[in-house]
Regions:
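N-terminal secretory signal peptides that target proteins for export/translocation
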Residues: 1-10
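Exposed low-complexity, polar/acidic, P/S/T/G-rich flexible segments that act as propeptides
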Residues: 160-190
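The catalytic-center signature of Zn2+-dependent metalloproteases
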Residues: 297-384
Length: 399
């Protein structure tokens, strides 16, 4: 995206929050109560309002449940689930096959705090897609910052009309490090798996330096030509068919030859902040354009690796540290903010990495890449704050 769109590395977070998806270095957004006696003595099934369908993710201490809902007197669909004493994190997901906007009305923790309410402290109001509402799918991730925890006990929710609500619930010990399995895919005929290996190494190095180990599987080539160039909208039928091929227990990276239509030139985008985890569906992966990272027939491996890592950050719940205009920032308290009021030196209304040097321009989740001159001079975006690392280490599909 350094033809103007390279700066748009990642479309604006709140475009996505009202989101269609997360464009590379884009961002998209981003909150119950019963007595919990004997929680530690009972199984999750005994304590949760779940159906009989349960899926254990291979190699992970994460289980997927569909939650039974009932219609309340207020007209909302209501349900509950119980987080055991060793609960680490959860992703509560809501689906609507018609692709109309869908969201939760409330999510209340065991202490009675509605984490989706603007009046609660802290809260995920207007941060979580599960509060804002998005087409076909939305979710709430806990923790999406260290200010939240998957408190043991009964959580309750109210939701608008939907097809189903499911939860990916991770249990185990408190993580000080993490391992995440990544599955790369490549489409088109211009580049092959070998062409992205250097970028995957860059991506792996970025996460390793921040306390996260990536297990990167061999790249899978998808030869069907309809997937060479796809829309960045995850409800698009072709994009949906591509992303649905991803593995449930992995972060799926789809290196496409290019985007189609007006999306062409964008570096990449994720299905949400976070996207889906633990279920194979249309929101279970990220898209990365190879054409947007090409210089002639050669791929810019450092930039491509940063883009892949950035979009993976979105998929696991990280926002842009600073959004395009320098007036919107992420929900973490330890990431640098680059304010328009004193850093937009050229007064164009867009915060560049150069203007924000020393103020988050080098963060992996800054909204746009360094320009070509800065990259040639060795500038990189590889840093993550302690709180950003926390979100990744607690991800439901990490171990």
């Amino acid at each position: 995206m350094f033809n103007q769109k390279e700066n748009l590395k990642y479309p604006s977070l709140f475009l996505i929050c009202f989101f269609i998806s997360t464009v590379l270095f884009l961002n998209s957004c981003g909150r119950f109560m019963l007595k919990d006696d004997g929680v530690e003595k009972k199984s999750i099934e005994e304590l949760s309002g779940v159906s009989s369908v349960k899926t254990n993710l291979d190699g992970l201490k994460t289980e997927i449940f569909e939650i039974t809902q009932t219609v309340g007197s207020d007209g909302f669909l209501a349900g509950f689930f119980v987080v055991p004493e060793d609960g680490v994190s959860f992703l509560l997901s809501i689906f609507l096959g018609s692709n109309y906007n869908i969201k939760f009305y409330s999510l209340t923790d065991p202490d009675g705090t509605d984490v989706l309410s603007a009046s609660s402290t802290p809260n995920l109001y207007e941060a979580s897609s599960g509060n804002i509402g998005t087409a076909g799918y939305a979710n709430v991730l806990v923790p999406q910052s260290p200010s939240f925890s998957a408190k043991a006990g009964t959580w309750t929710f109210k939701a608008y009309t939907n097809d189903r609500v499911s939860i990916a619930l991770r249990t185990g010990s408190t993580p000080s490090a993490a391992t995440i399995v990544v599955q790369p895919y490549i489409t088109g005929t211009t580049w092959s798996a070998g062409d992205i290996s250097a970028a995957l190494s860059v991506m792996s190095g970025i996460f390793s330096a921040n306390g996260i180990t990536l297990t990167i599987n061999s790249t899978i080539t998808i030869s069907d030509t309809q997937y060479s160039a796809v829309s960045g909208t995850f409800t698009d039928p072709t994009t949906s068919a591509l992303v649905t091929q991803g593995s449930a227990a992995k972060v799926n990276l789809f290196f496409i030859e290019d985007y189609s239509g007006s999306w062409s030139g964008i570096l990449g985008n994720a299905a949400g902040i976070p996207g889906s985890m633990g279920i194979a569906n249309s929101w279970n992966g990220v898209l990365i354009s190879l054409s947007a990272h090409a210089s002639g027939a050669t791929l810019k491996s450092q930039l491509l690796g940063e883009t892949a890592a950035h979009e993976m950050g979105h998929q696991l719940g990280l926002f842009h540290t600073t959004e395009t205009g320098g007036t919107v920032f992420d929900i973490l308290t330890d990431t640098a903010e680059c304010l328009n009021s004193n850093k937009d030196f050229d007064r164009n209304g867009k915060m560049s990495a150069e203007e924000c040097e020393g103020y988050g321009g080098d963060n992996l989740m800054f909204w746009t890449a360094w320009n070509s001159s800065s990259r040639s001079a060795g500038k990189k975006q590889e840093t993550l704050s302690n709180h950003q690392q926390h979100v990744l280490k607690y991800a439901p599909i990490a171990k």
